[in-house]
Swiss-Prot record:
The gene is AGO13. Coiled coil: none annotated. This is Protein argonaute 13. GO terms for cellular component: cytoplasm; nucleus. Probably involved in the RNA silencing pathway. May bind to short RNAs such as microRNAs (miRNAs) or short interfering RNAs (siRNAs), and represses the translation of mRNAs which are complementary to them. The lineage of its organism: Eukaryota, Viridiplantae, Streptophyta, Embryophyta, Tracheophyta. Keywords: RNA-mediated gene silencing. Transmembrane segments: none annotated. It holds the Pfam family ArgoN. Belongs to the argonaute family. Ago subfamily. One of its GO terms (molecular function) is RNA binding. GO terms for biological process: regulatory ncRNA-mediated gene silencing. Residues 183-296 form the PAZ domain. It comes from Oryza sativa subsp. japonica (Rice). Residues 472-770 form the Piwi domain.
Length: 1192
């Protein structure tokens, strides 16, 4: 069913002021396409070229028309031009170059007609019959210094928007941060607050500068006749007096200081400072800071510190009367009536702000506990307090303690805790005044250990007394920001305790309002209610979602005060919430899921009834995405409801919440108490939904909060869809009333609480996952990276064998041997002799990261050395001829064959599991395939099965001593890798057990970019079907070479397993261990196998610890990648635990057979397994899987 935007509107009556502009007449508009050769990505350059064209040919070839140009491809004129297509040539002088002969550049401009556009659609739109999008711009004006090398550009924002009275010009003051156009030396001095520039920069300072200047454009000034521009990509780790580079093809090398003196006769003053680097790491350009100047007009997009935020807010934070006056002055200054483009297109702008009617909604009556002196409360101007009031449901805190990382004295911390406890008890909570352990201070440099120590001591003490666990940890933060995210992550992710963070500047001098807010937060964290709204409305409030895919939903009725939140990871900058409803495939049935479905189930469990109406407050949607978001998310809501019960489709109201807009409302008369609050802003509850709103769609502006400083910004609520058929009064009153039950403070908030809570959930998830900071009132508002090591460090990626790649933070002086030692310790692997690969080459272990010129996220591969040693050992490991090993396989349960790195370029799918008797046949097929690959890639030497050996300690095959394999890696030739080989083997593996049609279906299910060389597999499949197949995989070499040219375009690795059923087609090496464990959970087996899965020994096999790639700290555990070691260890530990009286050897072995049969489809369900008992047992037994799975 198609969705249409809601078309209802409301009506209001009290005066509020806005800004209006009208269009006097409607003209015929002609659109032309512009192409400029040579092309330029800069709009400014394109505009200069076109302005030059208008100067030269405006009155002649252009017929006196003044065209409007967008700086790209489109040009508009008010009326026709004398031509339909014309080419012009103009010459433009580059003002940056002083040699005008070289600076003059010729441009060819082609203008051709694209179509005629009249303004009939605009008329229809303004009459409410058509929908369109506004055009917006931001104009910059005055500037102001905000510190640390940055400046604030103050200007104004303007957008032409449709309203019920015609076109409206919306103007507002705007400000943003830019780099100051100063020399890089000056920027560094301000940014680092350096006084003595003769001293060299520390590594800590160098890292800070690199982060601040990366991507910034600079221009050089050491050549008088030429100015060149570069983009900064990094900073050199050593000073330019020591930085040596080749200056010619003869190998001549000089330092940067020497080069500038010899080439430009320029003596560098800051020789102890590093150079800026431009270009790539392979071809760097070194630029001394003192000859570089930051190009003007570059926006600073990184996070500002507290001081800079304060300075930039001062530029725009103005009282309503001052802001209105400033906007009016801007309108007069811009002289819209004299604008030549406005005159050309017949637009007239009124200079006066226009009065529009509005109304003020009454605040709701709030309900508190009957035990308090005041049982109800009527907010005054959007605010109230907790004096003589008790929370509706006061929480209980019996076990708590406090930990301080600040410089507050112990007696100050104890006094704050006492005041907070007194406030909690006074407002209706039950708070034990005695902590579990004494309040203490701790070293801020060791936050994680301090938290773990407090948790350990309190848990031990409470366990002895039988009092449960720690219920609340009060934490006094550092004076400097940066610790909040780490504390939340450790407390909630690792330790599982509730924490309340407080800023030392508030805790040292707490006032009653602050203590009330903290008490309310603690009560909410104990899942209790602080107050209720006495409402006559029946629809339950539903959830909201922020741009980071956090969704919250109300869980009580009819109070609507308790909310539950869910967070879902999704694509970067994805505005649609992808996980509202999901469908999973199970071998037995279809499994429905998603956040909306979970909320509906939780609501029913909590209240005993299903939701009869849903109100969806949706945040984080831009206007251009309204239709797309509505269609996708309404469909998800309907599917989630229908999945619970057939025919269950509650009516939904879909409301988009927007705070980031530039509409401001001013009182009609400034200073009147009946029209303004204390800050001079409009009264809380002011709502506007006429005249300045959309001519057809249902939306309104609501200012639900009282202003604190500056001019209040009303929240824009856009009703996209309304099946509940709300009137404007009903939805506006409901939204306003909800703003009074935000659980963390005693005043009305500016945004409806579900939207607020979704932002909190999203930011909290970032804190717990990445250690980011939060903007809470009792916690810090920002966080900066802290460089812990004075020595320069670099994050690299290391892969050992086939374990998962892990990030390691190493010093630049670290050698390859240091990398090996740390990586092996991380994986708990012991290897005696290894190769270290950097890129595609083996490196010496003595080489350092600095000498290798490694950059961030460089990848290193550590593999056992497979050649050398005596005849019966390789790399210290015992080896036996592969033919002898094949003969010894017999009827063994399974065998693991590992593909050595010599045979795989990419390292994908590097080993196979081979079960039972087919092992010999499969290895023979492997050798046949290697012959095909040999022919395709032109090995330096041929080999046979006699050249291969088996290493029982590693469970892998390798080439014996003296066999050398070389790949042809020329780019112009297509090269097969062992990912292809392993995939082909797996195809043959399945082919031997299934129908050929299933194999072909699995291959052709691949989508572009999902697999590699599908044509090669097709060739192989055709060859499998050929009559010669009985003698092995003797491929048609001519046919193969004939199709080789088509294979060169394939780039990704072949992966035939991603789109297949995990229960049936799970292949070792093609998916992670986590999916395997999930598959185990789906297998219907007796419950006794879980004991082994949860044992400490098994957990060491299942998981490995990994480090945070940003902080380098131990962050948690992750499933191991499948490796030969973990598989063998898994089987050994599994059988060991099964034999501890839980099952017989026969059952344990059979269960292992069942598990492996779900990984590699080797056996049918009723196939009889062969069980090989220990030596002490006399005879073998045979049994079927059904016997083991029989519950009886």
């Amino acid at each position: 069913m198609p969705l249409k935007f809601c078309m209802e509107r409301g009506f209001q009556s009290h005066p509020v002021r806005g800004c209006l502009v009208g269009a006097s007449r409607f003209l015929s508009c002609i659109k032309f396409l512009v192409s400029i050769n040579p092309e330029s990505k800069s709009r400014a350059t394109n505009r200069e070229v076109l302005n030059e064209l208008i100067k030269l040919h405006g009155k002649t070839s252009l017929g006196g028309k003044l065209p409007a140009y967008d700086g790209r491809k489109s040009l508009y004129t008010a009326g026709s031009l004398p031509f339909e297509s014309e080419e012009f040539v103009v010459k433009l002088i580059d003002p940056e170059k002083k040699d005008k002969e070289r600076a003059e550049r010729e441009y060819k401009i082609t203008i051709r007609i694209a179509g005629r556009t009249d303004f009939y659609h605009l008329q229809q739109f303004l009459l409410g019959r058509q929908r369109d999008m506004p055009q917006e711009t931001i104009q910059f004006g005055h500037r102001g210094d905000i510190g640390e090398g940055l400046e604030c550009w103050r200007g104004y924002y303007q957008s032409l928007r449709p309203t019920q009275m015609g076109l409206s010009l919306n103007i507002d003051i705007s400000a943003t941060s830019f780099f100051k156009p100063v020399t890089v030396i000056q920027f560094v001095e301000e940014f680092l607050n350096i006084r003595d520039t003769s001293r060299p920069l520390s590594d800590r300072d160098r890292v800070k500068i690199k982060k601040a200047l990366r991507g910034v454009r600079i221009e050089t000034n050491h050549q008088e006749d030429q100015i060149r521009r570069y983009k900064i990509t990094g900073i050199t780790p050593i000073p330019m007096s020591q930085l040596i580079f080749p200056v010619d093809d003869n190998g001549t090398r000089k330092t940067v200081v020497q080069y500038f003196w010899d080439r430009y006769n320029y003596r560098l003053k800051y020789a102890s400072w590093p150079c800026l680097q431009s270009g790539s790491d392979s071809r760097p350009v070194y630029l001394p800071m003192e000859v570089c100047k930051i190009v003007e007009g570059q926006r600073y997009s990184k996070k500002l510190n507290n001081k800079q935020v304060t300075n930039i807010l001062r530029a725009t934070c103005q009282r309503p009367q001052q802001r209105e006056q400033r906007i009016h002055e801007m309108v007069l200054h811009n002289k819209y009536t004299d604008d030549r483009f406005a005159q050309e297109f017949g637009i007239k702008v009124c200079n006066d702000l226009v009065s529009v009617p509005a109304r003020v909604l009454p605040p709701p009556m709030l309900k508190y506990h009957d035990s308090g002196r005041e049982k109800t409360c009527a907010p005054s101007v959007g605010q109230w307090n907790m004096i003589n009031k008790k929370m509706i449901n006061g929480g209980t805190v019996d076990n708590w303690t406090c930990l301080s990382f600040s410089r507050m004295r112990p007696e100050e911390v104890q006094r704050f805790c006492g005041d907070l406890i007194q406030m909690c008890n006074a407002t209706g909570m039950s708070f034990n005044p005695r902590p579990v352990v004494d309040v203490r201070s701790s070293n801020p440099n060791n936050i994680e250990n301090a938290l773990r120590d407090v948790h350990s001591r309190t848990s031990e003490l409470l366990a002895r007394e039988g009092k449960g666990g720690l219920q609340l940890l009060i934490v006094i933060l550092l004076e400097v920001s940066g610790s909040y995210g780490k504390i939340k992550r450790v407390c909630e992710n690792d330790l599982g305790i509730v924490s309340q963070c407080c800023l030392p500047r508030h805790a040292s001098r707490p006032n009653k309002q602050y203590l009330e807010n903290v008490a309310l937060k603690i009560n909410v964290k104990k899942s209790q209610q602080s107050s209720l709204v006495l409402m006559s409305h029946t629809p339950p409030g539903e959830d909201s979602a922020s741009s980071i895919a956090a969704v919250v939903a109300s869980m009580d009725w009819p109070e609507i005060t308790k909310y539950r939140g869910l967070v879902s990871a999704q694509s970067h900058r994805q505005e649609i919430i992808e996980d509202l409803f999901s469908v999973g495939k199970d071998p037995v049935k279809v499994v429905n899921g998603g956040m909306i479905r979970e909320f509906l189930i939780a609501f029913r469990k909590k209240t005993g009834r299903r939701p009869e109406r849903i109100i969806f407050y949706r945040d984080g949607v831009s206007e251009g995405q309204f239709s797309r978001v509505l269609l996708h998310e309404m469909d998800a809501i309907r599917k989630a409801c229908a999945s619970l019960e057939e025919g269950y489709l509650p009516p939904v109201t879909f409301v988009v919440v927007q705070k980031r807009h530039h509409t401001r409302l001013f009182p009609e008369v400034h200073g009147r108490r009946d029209m303004t609050d204390k800050s001079g802003n409009i009264l809380p509850g002011t709502v506007k939904d006429r005249q300045i709103c959309h001519p057809t769609e249902f939306y309104f502006y609501l200012c639900s909060h009282a202003g604190i400083q500056g001019t209040s910004r009303p929240t824009h609520y856009h009703v996209l869809y309304d099946e509940n058929h709300f009137t404007a009064d009903e939805l506006q009153t409901l939204t306003n009333n909800l703003c009074y039950i935000y659980a963390r403070c005693t005043h009305a908030v500016s945004v409806v609480p579900p939207a607020y809570y979704s932002h909190l959930a999203a930011s909290h998830a970032h804190c717990c996952i990445k250690g980011h900071s939060s903007g809470s009132g009792s916690t810090p508002g920002n966080e900066h990276d802290i460089v812990k090591n004075s020595a320069p460090t670099l994050q690299i990626l290391v892969k050992v064998l086939d374990f998962q790649i892990v990030p390691l933070t190493m010093k630049l002086k670290s050698s390859a041997e240091d990398i090996v030692a740390l990586a092996l310790s991380k994986h708990r692997v012991s290897l005696h002799d290894v190769y270290v690969y950097h890129g595609r080459r083996v490196i010496a272990k003595s080489l350092t990261l600095e000498s290798l010129k490694a950059d961030r996220d460089s990848t290193f591969l550590i593999m056992p050395r497979m050649r050398g040693g005596c005849n019966d050992t390789i790399g210290g490991f015992k080896c036996i001829p592969l033919e002898q090993h094949i003969r010894s396989l017999g009827d063994s349960l399974f065998e693991i064959i590992w593909i050595p790195p010599d045979l795989r370029v990419s390292g994908f799918c590097s080993y196979l599991i081979i079960l039972g008797k087919p092992a010999r046949k499969i290895i023979c097929q492997l050798l046949k395939l290697l012959e095909i690959i040999h022919a395709a890639n032109r090995f330096a030497s041929r080999f046979t099965i006699a050249d291969l050996v088996f290493l029982p300690d590693l469970g892998c095959i390798a080439f014996k001593k003296g066999v050398k394999i070389r790949w042809n890696l020329r780019r112009e030739e297509y090269k097969l890798n062992m990912g292809d080989v392993a995939s082909i083997i797996s195809c043959w593996f399945r082919f031997n057990r299934r129908k050929l049609e299933a194999l072909e279906a699995g291959i052709h299910e691949l989508r572009p970019g999902q697999g590699d060389s599908p044509m090669f597999v097709d060739i192989l499949v055709k060859d499998l079907r050929s009559p010669t197949h009985e003698t092995g995989l003797s491929a048609n070499y001519r046919g193969f070479y004939k199709n080789c040219s088509a294979l060169r375009s394939c780039s990704a690795h072949m992966n035939l397993f991603t789109s297949l059923d995990i229960r049936k087609d799970f292949m070792v090496g093609s998916a992670d261990w986590g999916n395997f464990v999930k598959a185990l959970g789906d297998i219907k087996l007796p419950g006794w196998y879980r004991t082994a899965m949860r044992s400490p020994e098994m957990r060491k096999v299942l998981f490995f610890e990994f480090n945070d790639p940003h902080t380098g700290e131990l962050r948690g555990k992750r499933y191991r990648a499948l490796s030969v070691f973990s598989w063998l260890e898994f089987a050994r530990i599994f059988i060991k635990h099964m034999k501890k009286g839980l099952c017989t050897d026969k059952q344990a072995t059979a269960l292992l057979c069942v598990i492996f049969s779900n990984i590699v489809p080797v056996v049918e369900k009723k196939l009889t397994y062969s069980y090989r008992p220990p030596a002490k047992e006399k005879s073998n037994e045979s049994f079927t899987v059904e016997e083991i799975l029989d519950p009886s």
